[in-house]
C-alpha cells in the first residue's frame, strides 16, 4: 500500500507541476514601481498634514527716480615725475704690458657725489670737470685727474647708446683710459666719468617716499619744500633748494639745447649720488579721484536703508547709504569743476526740453570707495501723463506734433509702470501659489482617509505603505521581492475539491513570489495596484457572466475574460488620459552682462611704486654698457699674471721692486716660450718643424753610417784617390803644380828632383820600415798630395762649368779660352 500511495503521489505531483507551468504567466517588472509587499510593520513613523500655513500679501514699496549718474573711482596710479641724478665714477685700472698685448688685471671703481657747484655747471653747460677730490679721512684729501694729466679740464656729456623709455643716461668717458706702460711692467691709470641720469620717479599716497626707475629710493615726500609739514626722513642738512632755477632740458645737443625755468628745485646728496627734482604743490598736481564713466540715463531705487543705482548699459547696481557724502578733503577739489561741467553738458544736450532738475546734485560713496555724483531729474509732463492714463480709454484725435511730444514721455512712463506691474504680478503669483499649496494640503489630508498608501506614495515620490491610525498616519517602507520570481496565475476562479467553483471568483489575480534573500520557497498572494502584492487570497467576489478585466503588471496589461487569462499587451498601447495641465512660460532672454573693468591693466601696472620690469631693463642696459666697455679694455688675462701682482703688492715697497724685476725676466721668458708655441701652432711652422726634424734624423743616420765606414776603411774614406791608378793621380798633381805660380807651402827637398817626383809602382807598395822623421815627411807629402788632388778636382769642375745667363749678357761678343791656350 505504501508503495502504491507513493507512486500515485509522484504521478500527481508531476501532473500538477506540468499543469502549473502552463497555468503561469511571466510578468515584467517596473524599475520605478517594482513588485513589493506594503504592510504596516510594528515600528512605524507617524506623520500628519500641517494645514496651518499663513500666506503674506505682497506689497511693493520701492520708489524709483531717474537722473544723471557720474562715477569716480580712486586713482591707484602712482604719481610720476622727473628726477635727474649726478655722480662721478673714479676708476683705477692696473695693467700689465706684454709683447703686443696689454692685460687688464684689476679695476677699482669708486663712485662719488658730484659737487653742487659742478652740478650747476652740468645743468647749464652740459659739461663737467676732469678732477675729483677724494677724502680718505678728515685730514687726508686727494685730488684725482682724468688720464693722470694733473690739469683740470672740462669734459663734454655724450648720450649713452644703451637707453630705455624711462631712463636716459649721459656720460663723459665711453672707454676707460689705459696707460701703456713699459714692456713687462705693471702700470696704473686713472679715469673719471661723469654720469648724469634722467629718469622717472614714482610716489604713492600718502607720499612719504619715492622710488626711481633705476631702483634707488629717497625716504621723503617729493612735495617737501623745507618749510611745510610733508614727510621727509632724509638728513635735512643734505638737501638744498633753489628758486626759479634755469637748466637744460636735455643734453642731447650739448649747451645748445632748450632751457627750462622751474619754480623750485631740490638737490639732495644721498650716498654717492646727487638727486634733483622739481618741488611741486601737492594740492594742484595730485588728484586722488579719476573719472570712470558717465551714465546719462540711470535709475535710483530707494529701499529701506539704502539706494540702488541701476544702469541698464552696465547690467549692474551700485549700493550706497542714504546719507550724502561731503567732499571736504582738499584731495577732492580737483573734480569739482569736472563733474559740474559734465552735468551741465548732459542736461543741456539731452534733457533740456523734457526734464527739469529735481533739486541740486547729490554725492554718495559706495562700499567699494566709488564716488557717485547723482543729479535727480523729473519729467515735465509726468503728472499730465499720469492723469491721462487714469482717464477714459476711448480714442481721441491728436495732432501729429503733440503725438511726437507725448511718445517719448509715454515710453518712459510705460517703462516705470511696467516695472511696478511686473513686480506686483510676481508678488500676487507668489501669494496665489501659497494659497494653492494650502488648499492642496487640505485635499490630501481628506484623501488620505480613503487611500492612505496612495497619498503618501504620491507625496514621497516612491512606493510607501500607510495606514490611518486615528487622526495620524502610520508610514512604513515597502519590502521588495525577487522580481524574477513573480508569476501571475491564468485563472481567477476558486478551486473546490480539484474542480472550479462556478459561484465564487477572485477579484484580483493570484500570483506566486519569493523573497530575494530567502530560500526557493514560494508564497501565494494577489496582484494589487501599481505592482503591489496583496498578502493572502481572500479577496473574492461572485462570478459575473461575460466578464472582461484588464490588470496592469510591470509594463504589460493582462486581459482576463470570464476570469481566465487570454493574452497580454504593452501598457503603451492603451491611450493615457491626459489630466496634467502644462504651464507654458517662456523663459526670459539671456542678459548680456557687461564686464565692468574698474581699473585697466595699465592703471594696475602703474599702481606700484617699484616697477620691476623697468628696473630690470635699466639694470640689463647698464650691464650691457659695462660689458661693451670691458671688451674694449683688454683680452683675456692669464691668471698667473694677476696672482704675481697680488703677491708682490702684499710684500710692500720691496715686493713691488722685486716684482718689477721678476716681471721683466718672466715676461721675456714667457714671450720666448709663447713665440715658440705660437710658431708651432701655425700650420706653416708646424710643417717646417716636421721637415727639419726629418732632416736632422736623416743627417744623424748619414753621419752614423760614415763613421762606421771610416772605422772600417779609414784610408778609402780619408783618401779616396788611393783607389785610383798612380798615373792618373800624378798627372792631376803635376798639372795643378804647373798652373800654380806661388805654392801655398814649401815642398820637401825630396820632391824637387825628377827622380823623387816620379815614384815607381813598386816603391809605393814597398814594405820597408821608416824612421819617425821619414814617417813625418811622408805624412806631409800625403797632405800636399791631398791638397793637390782637391785643387785638381776644383779646377776640373770650373773647366766644365758653363757661364750663367747674366755672364753671357755681360760679356757678349767675347769667346771663352781654354786653360791650355793660357
Swiss-Prot record:
Signal peptide extent: 1-22
Region (Involved in fusion and/or binding to host membrane): 95-101, 181-188
Coiled-coil intervals, chain numbering: none
Region (Disordered): 740-767
Sequence ranges on the Intravirion membrane side: 705-822
Disulfide bonds: 38-478, 55-434, 128-194, 287-334, 505-543
Glycosylation sites: 152, 244, 324, 338, 352, 358, 387, 390, 482, 517, 567
Mod. after translation: A proteolytic cleavage by host furin generates two subunits that remain linked by disulfide bonds.
Major subcellular location class: virion
Motif (Internalization motif): 814-817
Cross-referenced SUPFAM superfamilies: Viral glycoprotein ectodomain-like
GO cellular component, one term: host cell Golgi membrane
Annotated GO biological process: symbiont entry into host cell; virion attachment to host cell
UniProt topology in membrane: Single-pass type I membrane protein
Keyword Transferase tagged: no
Parts of the chain that traverse the membrane: 684-704
Biased composition (Basic and acidic residues): 753-766
Ranges where the record places region Hydrophobic membrane proximal region: 629-681, 650-670
The protein's assembly and partners: Homotrimer; disulfide-linked. Binds to heparan sulfate proteoglycans. Interacts with gH/gL heterodimer.
Family of this protein: Belongs to the herpesviridae glycoprotein B family.
Listed HAMAP family: HSV_GB
Function: Envelope glycoprotein that forms spikes at the surface of virion envelope. Essential for the initial attachment to heparan sulfate moieties of the host cell surface proteoglycans. Involved in fusion of viral and cellular membranes leading to virus entry into the host cell. Following initial binding to its host receptors, membrane fusion is mediated by the fusion machinery composed at least of gB and the heterodimer gH/gL. May be involved in the fusion between the virion envelope and the outer nuclear membrane during virion egress.
Protein name as it appears in the record: Envelope glycoprotein B
Organism, scientific name: Human herpesvirus 7 (strain JI) (HHV-7)
